[in-house]
Each structure stands twice: as C-alpha cells, then as structure tokens.
Amino acid sequence: MRSLRLRTVVVATIVVCLSVLLSPTEVDGSCDFPLGACTPFRDCKESCIKFKTRAGQTFFDGKCRPRDRPSVWTACFCCYYDSIGAQ
C-alpha cells in the first residue's frame, strides 16, 4: 500500500514537471492602449485588430479589463509589440 502511494506521488510529480517544461512560453507584448468599452455588442479583439493609431501602429489582440472606477462595462485595451519585440 505504501509503495503504491509513493508511486502515485512520483508519477504525479513527473507529469507536473513535464507539463511545465513542455508548455509553450508566450510573449504577449503590452496591452495598455485603451480603446473604449467592452460590451456584449462589440468584440474587443476584432476592434483592436482593425484599429490603427496615427503613428501607424497596429495591434494583434485586445483584452477586457476592469475599469479604474465602477462601471457596467469593462475597458478594452489593445495589445501591441514595440520595435524591439514584445514589450
């Protein structure tokens, strides 16, 4: 019984370690460019991908985050890479 429990712990530890080591490392960049509100009627990611700044900067994703002040809707922030890579 004791060896079965030890074997289970060892196998679980190996599985956890392998999943951490084999998981892809992602660099998301910076998501701090505000672009209005996230609502059920508007997709934040699609809005950010379509939007281009005056400087010509493009975005690859959009994230909804809580606002600084209480609100019904969350805020949409666009994600971008800087010229060096991910910020």
From Swiss-Prot:
Keyword Disulfide bond assigned: yes
Gene Ontology biological-process entries: defense response to fungus; killing of cells of another organism
Superkingdom of source: Eukaryota
Signal peptide span: 1-29
Compartmental location: Secreted
GO-annotated cellular components: extracellular region
Alphabetized UniProt keyword annotations: Antimicrobial, Disulfide bond, Fungicide, Plant defense, Secreted, Signal
Disulphide-bridged cysteine pairs: C31-C79, C38-C64, C44-C76, C48-C78
Predominant subcellular localization, coarse grouping: secreted
Family affiliation: Belongs to the DEFL family.
Protein name (record): Defensin-like protein 100
Organism field: Arabidopsis thaliana (Mouse-ear cress)
